[in-house]
Amino acid sequence: MSFHYRKEVISPEVLQELYSLTPEQKAQKEIRDAQIRAIITGESDKFLLIIGPCSADHEDSVCEYITRLAKMQEKVEEKILIVPRIYTNKPRTTGEGYKGIVHQPDPEKAPDFMEGLIAMRKMHLRAISETGLFSADEMLYPENWPYISDILSYVAVGARSVEDQQHRMTVSGMNVPAGMKNPTSGDFSVMLNSCIAAQSSHTFLYRGHEVTTDGNPLAHTILRGAVNKHGQNIPNYHYEDLERLHEKYSLLNLHNPACIVDANHSNSGKKHYEQPRIVDEVLHSRLVNPAIAELVKGVMVESYLLPGSQKVNEHEYGKSITDPCLGWDETERLIDKIASHL
């Protein structure tokens, strides 16, 4: 019943030096970050689509998927800004199962955090090099932020992490948009309180230092559905939910009121095929209510090369080994449909 220190891992400074952005990529990122920021602040009316596999399990299939996304981005660039999901850390409800490439660079082998941190950064960089798109990742471990702080354009804080003080304070030091999900209980006030905390300045301990942050005015909400005391999924993407969130925002003095709707998780009951229908309903709510249109900046969708999911040892290329995802054909149709409705 104690910690067993196995080995020291690579530092963020060394990892960034070994695998770094080129000057051209840094310039591209500044442009992309400004475009995403403009959507969150309301300066741009483009629609934000954060889309990709539930978990970024294999570099080749993930990068092939993002290459296809990049072609779709060219097609819909006048209306939609696509941010690929490269989720390298996965929260697990019971602690069991694949926890992401940072834990296990090979899903069938034992955890290796040294290799996992390297694999995480290499995957993000390869996606940037091959597509010019800059990605989103979930901040499961606040101490990992410096390893990818220079390459991410969007961060999500999950339903189980959003109440944690260290997550909130770490977001307050970021310079990119951060989506704070509603907790699994569905409580809007918890989600909004996390935005208040993330938009505020804090002084705290972080990676061996006392640090002070400026606050992140781009922190915003993500609606992902809820689970009641009986374990039943309770969606919160409906018109009434969006209207209620707008009302709650109006009572607070938050910067840049904004919401992303997560079309999977408890909103779909993890029925991946429901995601297009959910997105369609969100788009309709935006169409009939200008206040909702102003608040809801985009959606989050889980998709991959092949539909559904599989066990870790089944080895079907481009198919999720965690939650079920849309396949590419459905993804392409969904992106086209979103563009046609905007």
Regions found by a protein language model. Give the residues of each.
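Short acidic, Gly/Ser-rich segments with clustered Asp/Glu that frequently serve as metal-coordination loops
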Residues: C54-D57, N256, N264-K270
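Active-site-facing alpha/beta catalytic cores
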Residues: I66, K79-R244, H265-K271, Q275-E281, ...
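Conserved, mostly hydrophobic/aromatic
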Residues: G52, V261, G327
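Internal helix-turn-beta structural module
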Residues: Y304-L342
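Conserved phosphate/anionic-ligand binding catalytic regions in large, soluble enzymes, centered on
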Residues: L48-S61, D323
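N- or domain-start disorder-to-order transition segments that initiate the globular core
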Residues: M1-T41
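N-terminal beta-rich core of secreted/periplasmic extracellular enzymes
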Residues: Q25-G42, M72-V83, N89, M120
